[in-house]
Amino acid sequence: MITIEREAMEFDVVIVGAGPAGLSAAIKIRQLAIENNLPDLSVCVVEKGSEVGAHILSGAVLEPRAINELFPNWKEEGAPLNVPVTEDKTYFLMSDEKSQEAPHWMVPKTMHNDGNYVISLGNVVRWLGQKAEELEVSIFPGFAAAEILYHADGTVKGIQTGDMGIGKDGEPTHNFAPGYELHAKYTLFAEGCRGHLGKRLINKFNLDQDADPQHYGIGIKELWEIDPAKHKPGLVMHGSGWPLSETGSSGGWWLYHAENNQVTLGMIVDLSYENPHMFPFMEMQRWKTHPLIKQYLEGGKRISYGARAVVKGGLNSLPKLTFPGGCLIGDDAGFLNFAKIKGSHTAMKSGMLCGEAVFEAIARGVDKGGDLAIARVVEGEDLFDKELTTYTQKFDKSWLKEELHRSRNFGPAMHKFGLWIGGAFNFVDQNIFKVPFTLHDLQPDYSALKTQDQATFKPNYPKPDGKLTFDRLSSVFVSNTVHEENQPSHLKLTDASIPVAVNLPRWDEPAQRYCPAGVYEIVDEGEGNKRFQINAANCVHCKTCDIKDPSQNITWVTPEGGGGPNYPNM
């Protein structure tokens, strides 16, 4: 076995992921360090995307509460919040032709968007990255965090970035470059929904032992440039019903009018769906043919496409936030408010709360004689708190906890009671009075899938026309997804026989359909032989396979840094 020598770099804080949570944490730490005369406190952010914002995908309507706190003068400082919400409409699609708008008073207050902004979260994150660099945060795009490093006592020591130049055979190629070790007093994990290192930490430290199972959806999004005559900047539309109602599946859709004659539209399909024949990508394509949606897109042009799992378990599914040497923030923990269909402001606030706790712990350690820019290198030293319990305390006293507590029943009600009764329950809970009990949803999403014998209904998905509706491969093309071809697959099978031997006869191998990028195929090799093929280069890093595989046989790990989608203005 080859021993690889790695360069190690020391920081006070290492943050994994340059999204809204990670960058808000970095900014808050550096703001406090400068304000309190600790200007040498060092913060490093590693980002697997080719640039900050490359992997960011969201609706998005931003509630500005957190950014107001982080940058009170954000407007003067040029934050790209340029389109205030001007109209707020909610619809139920009754069929492929009919729709009904809900009166505003019937919509849960959590879904009202007064004072919010239609944004590109990718562009907001790029702006946050610039502000972080102005505060001397070190940001390393194109470096994927591949492994967690531990001290001998089990405390998290930092992370190792992925090696570059490993061939498909697992051996170093001529351009091999070893990954770096990044050591820190505290390591914050902000990888987004279903982060692969966050998943390991939750398992290692049993962080979810007192929580409900986490729940997810798959969000599929397109960006269109439309006829200026049809463009209504600030119009926000949400809805549910057809076509998901045909398979008894839950989820919803959005269409937002942004700036520059662009609309962002998409669908979230709850990954608790039961019918193995359901095809989330094609459900979204079919939805666009409804007259309510089609009217805006006709004569327009699709600019970009993307997909990403979203975390929706809320407060009931929130794991323990801290462990020795680090914390989970943002959607790595699961702070999205499903009742609002928003997670950007909650991710930012979680990062800010954690940033405050980190700074205070480091400042206390320095007061005791600890050094800056040197990780916790002495085993058992007590100059710096091993576990940041103050982060949890700050969360418990925050508006973030209050907001998530208020919304804790929203998802379980929809899952337990269905669209109509669940919707009525949520209207009462959110608009009239707070119910004095908590609902729980204890079934993991992957286990909800029925066998193909139990679910005989197969939806009809027309062939895409290439103008309004599209196939997956042409969609991946406009996501600008690129991977180094000569590298090991980052989609790992625990047992390579399961897709054909188990999943195919039981569920018609649902990976063929739940993947929004066409990564998984069943190839007929003749004479009754079938093969499971993984087209890893197509992967848009949505993590759906890691979540929904009914045999829990697929594990997503990070490919080479810089690979994956390159989302513009998404």
Curated annotation (Swiss-Prot):
SUPFAM superfamilies named among the record's database cross-references: 4Fe-4S ferredoxins, FAD-linked reductases, C-terminal domain, FAD/NAD(P)-binding domain
Residues annotated as binding [4Fe-4S] cluster: 515, 539, 542, 545
Cofactor note text: Binds 1 [4Fe-4S] cluster.
Gene Ontology MF annotations: 4 iron, 4 sulfur cluster binding; electron-transferring-flavoprotein dehydrogenase activity; metal ion binding
Signal sequence, start to end: none
Cofactors (names): [4Fe-4S] cluster; FAD
EC id: 1.5.5.1
Keywords linked to the UniProt accession: 4Fe-4S, Electron transport, FAD, Flavoprotein, Iron, Iron-sulfur, Metal-binding, Oxidoreductase, Transport, Ubiquinone
Enzyme class: oxidoreductase
UniProt xrefs under Gene3D superfamilies: 3.30.70.20, 3.30.9.90, FAD/NAD(P)-binding domain
4Fe-4S ferredoxin-type domain boundaries: 530-559
Binding site for FAD: 13-27
Catalytic activity field: a ubiquinone + reduced [electron-transfer flavoprotein] = a ubiquinol + oxidized [electron-transfer flavoprotein] + H(+)
Protein's job: Accepts electrons from ETF and reduces ubiquinone.
Entry protein name: Probable electron transfer flavoprotein-ubiquinone oxidoreductase
Organism classification: Bacteria, Pseudomonadati, Pseudomonadota, Gammaproteobacteria, Moraxellales
